[in-house]
């Protein structure tokens, strides 16, 4: 499959998720959940990929949160701006999403924890409000908690099913393409300009950097460590 065919296939999948899952929810209102979920997956996989650094003996998602010491968390947050525990990763939340009766509040707590992990650090201003438009308790998702959770689980599962490959340069391209595609299509269907969309500031930076062909230096600003070996690894 050529890169253009791969991109077209991915766009069809994403648009299907955006339309099939939302049900009666207005597409313009639902946009932040699709974009936010894609963003959540992106930062989770970026985070894990940096920690593992190609080492097959490390699987960050399978580590217990208890292995993260205050020193590791502090050092990582100082270095990379925020911290995310293994249990908070997209892959782990999605794995149990369908049977999780508190999914909406669990997601809200995770997003709040990611943002608050930067409190007191130089990155606080950049991280604050990162998930502000991803309101997991909004009635836009449904009138009951069950309805909200069902829709959130469907979005998580849909985004998890997207074939984005390993987290390398090509995947960064695909995430950027997905954002650009969704923004332009939502805007066109709502009769609005793309500039009216909320896009996480770091994704905006990502897309801008990608267009300037700066992939070799891109780290997205969201990385951490889960071992002394990772802590001592050079950063670029």
Name each model feature, range by range:
Residues 1-206, 210-211:
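Non-catalytic, mostly N-terminal accessory regions of nucleic-acid modification and defense proteins
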């Amino acid at each position: 499959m050529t890169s253009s065919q791969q991109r077209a296939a991915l766009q069809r999948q994403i648009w299907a998720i955006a339309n099939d899952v939302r049900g009666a929810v207005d597409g313009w209102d639902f946009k932040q959940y699709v974009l936010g979920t894609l963003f959540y997956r992106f930062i989770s996989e970026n985070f894990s990929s940096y920690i593992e650094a190609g080492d097959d003996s490390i699987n960050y998602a399978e580590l217990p949160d208890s292995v993260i010491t205050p020193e590791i968390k502090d050092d990582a947050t100082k270095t990379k701006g925020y911290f995310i525990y293994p249990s908070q990763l997209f892959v782990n939340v999605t794995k149990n999403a369908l049977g999780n009766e508190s999914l909406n509040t669990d997601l809200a707590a995770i997003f709040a924890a990611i943002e608050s992990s930067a409190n007191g650090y130089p990155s606080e201003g950049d991280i604050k409000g990162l998930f502000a438009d991803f309101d997991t308790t909004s009635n836009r998702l449904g009138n009951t908690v069950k309805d909200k959770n069902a829709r959130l689980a469907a979005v998580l599962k849909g985004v998890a099913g997207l074939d984005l490959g390993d987290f390398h340069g090509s995947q960064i391209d695909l995430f950027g393409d997905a954002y650009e595609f969704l923004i332009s299509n939502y805007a066109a269907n709502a009769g609005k300009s793309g500039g009216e969309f909320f896009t996480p500031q770091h994704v905006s930076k990502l897309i801008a950097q990608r267009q300037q062909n700066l992939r070799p230096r891109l780290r997205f600003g969201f990385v951490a460590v889960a071992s002394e070996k990772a802590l001592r690894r050079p950063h670029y």
